[in-house]
């Protein structure tokens, strides 16, 4: 079950990266360059109350601070994918506030 969750999260990340790469080639979604690299925060909320946070730093390309939210069906738990400018350098995150749709 946990392996399936991870595979779903990885699939969502790959799909998001492909979409961003396509939009970057077209020059649609990334008109504003940011100086620092953006971090991809994926927070998963399980029904048991335990949350799993995957932190992955994307390549330092130009990106905007638009928020992309992907939510799955409620039975699988909520999954939020958000692009934010990197506040901390590629370090470990202690705790993040809950993301609410």
Swiss-Prot record:
Main location group: nucleus
Localization of this protein: Nucleus
Keyword annotations from UniProtKB, A to Z: Developmental protein, Differentiation, DNA-binding, Metal-binding, Nucleus, Sexual differentiation, Transcription, Transcription regulation, Zinc
Biased composition (Low complexity): 52-75
Region (Disordered): 52-79
GO biological process: cell differentiation; sex differentiation
GO cellular component: nucleus
Residues within the DNA-binding region(s): 1-13
Gene Ontology MF annotations: DNA-binding transcription factor activity, RNA polymerase II-specific; metal ion binding; RNA polymerase II cis-regulatory region sequence-specific DNA binding
Record Pfam families: Dmrt1
UniProt xrefs under InterPro entries: DMRT, DMRT1-like
Function: May be required for testis development.
Family per record: Belongs to the DMRT family.
The protein's name in its UniProt record: Doublesex- and mab-3-related transcription factor 1
